């Protein structure tokens, strides 16, 4: 039995919780199956997810992803327990390592041993959700004596991953794997590492859901859309996590130039390292048919759930056009 293909709106919709509530209402009325949060700052994703309990009647709510360094496993397990009760059968806990900018800069927390930390967090949270009393001494975490009431149907735990070691661990330990900001040429290699991790755990890779946050802009002006993507995401690729991933994905020269430009505080050099071809490999830009075709191609490549994340920041008309292109009456994943 093949895994269901799903289409999601991205959340939060704005700095105001009420806008996320309205986006979910719109998504349900327009054939979307899911709504997935990013979890970086305000409004808090997990709190807002709880606010959707009285609103979301059918869509699945996910978080892609909560950084494992900002909450202890016991806090994550307690939060997931509550959200699973509020959204029974329709909540996915997404965990990941985040980036140096967010952890070191925003939170003052060292991003150390990310593969091990994500793995140990996932294992601990899963055991806590099952009601097991904690007795864990790991390389990055320890917990003793914590126990919470078990759920009959605990929420699945999905793990964010970019490069081989993290992808393999995520497929081995997680119930699903979350991708982000990858060039399309890298997808076959990424899927090979999903298969390796699944085999290590004795699982079929076909049973592991692959979620992707797709940066999309339905537009008649590709040049403008490319420049928006460069302005928004060149700084991402300057961080060590994404810079190393970009080099691994086949853009080592661009990665080197981006890092150098960022170190020199030269935003023009940083953004200019991203060629049109490279931007088109990562972002999904163009008219409705072009954007739909790329999502369908990604589905054929192994992506099950596509989070539509419009690039049209601050422009409600462009955002609405992008979301409308994937509404149920106009788009079908098959």
Question: Where do the language-model regions lie?
Answer:
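Active-site-adjacent structural elements that line small-molecule/cofactor binding pockets in enzymes
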Residues: 1-334
């Amino acid at each position: 039995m093949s895994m269901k293909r799903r289409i999601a709106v991205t959340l939060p919709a704005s700095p105001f919780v009420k806008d996320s509530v309205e986006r979910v209402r719109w998504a349900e009325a327009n054939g979307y199956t899911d709504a997935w949060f990013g979890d970086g700052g305000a409004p808090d994703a997990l709190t807002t997810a709880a606010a959707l309990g009285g609103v979301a009647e059918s869509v699945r709510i996910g978080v892609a992803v909560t950084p494992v360094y900002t909450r202890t496993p016991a806090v994550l397990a307690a939060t997931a327990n509550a959200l699973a009760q509020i959204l029974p059968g329709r909540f996915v806990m997404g965990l990941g390592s985040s980036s140096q900018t967010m952890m070191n800069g925003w939170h003052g927390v060292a991003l150390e041993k990310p593969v091990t930390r994500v793995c140990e967090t996932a294992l601990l949270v899963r055991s806590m959700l099952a009601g097991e009393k904690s007795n864990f001494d790991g390389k990055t975490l320890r917990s003793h004596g914590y126990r919470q009431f078990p759920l009959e149907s605990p929420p699945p735990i999905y793990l964010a991953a970019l490069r081989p070691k993290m992808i393999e661990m995520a497929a081995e330990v997680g119930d699903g794997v979350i991708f982000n900001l990858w060039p399309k040429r890298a997808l076959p290699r990424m899927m090979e590492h999903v298969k390796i991790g699944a085999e290590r755990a004795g699982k079929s890779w076909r049973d592991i859901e692959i979620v992707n946050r797709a940066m999309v802009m339905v537009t008649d002006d590709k040049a403008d859309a490319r420049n928006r993507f460069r302005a928004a995401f060149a700084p991402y690729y300057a961080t060590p996590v994404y810079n190393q991933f970009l080099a691994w994905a086949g853009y080592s020269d661009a990665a080197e130039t981006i890092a150098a430009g960022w170190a020199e505080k030269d935003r023009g050099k940083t953004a200019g390292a991203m060629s049109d071809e490279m931007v088109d490999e990562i972002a999904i830009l163009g008219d409705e048919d072009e954007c739909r075709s790329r999502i369908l191609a990604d589905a054929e490549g192994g992506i099950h759930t596509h989070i539509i994340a419009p690039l049209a920041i601050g422009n409600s008309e462009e955002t609405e056009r992008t979301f409308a292109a994937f509404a149920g009456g106009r788009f079908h994943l098959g």
